[in-house]
Amino acid sequence: MNLLVIGAHPDDGEYRVAGTAVKLAARGHRVKFLNLTDGGAGHHEISGPALAARREKESAESRRRLGIDAIETWSVPDGELMPTLELRREVIRRIREWQADVVITHRPNDYHPDHRYCSVLVQDAAFMVT
């Protein structure tokens, strides 16, 4: 089975799906986390490129520790995700490339706008990819 976890930010997949990802990866399933923004906001001490770089390193370490196959992070600025046609097409492309059997994402009524828009993108992409 191929699992694709699509989150708005680096660390969203780890917070929400790490247990499932570890169990599936340990059983030989392919697991990928896709982060739609760079994670450059939301910290009280650093932000922008410095925080995005830190999150990229954290993602690499998460991949190693969780034993998952891949983590991809897009360059969309944190806090600026919008459910555009262009991004929907990119999500569709990633679902097809990974040959995802299961896609997990945010709930549509989340408190964070990036989480809500990520959910919309994935819902729309899932409809279009079939």
Give a label for each model feature.
Residues 1-6, 82-130:
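Metal-dependent de-N-acetylase/amidase catalytic core
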Residues 1-98:
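Active-site rim/loop-helix segments in enzyme catalytic domains that contact anionic ligands
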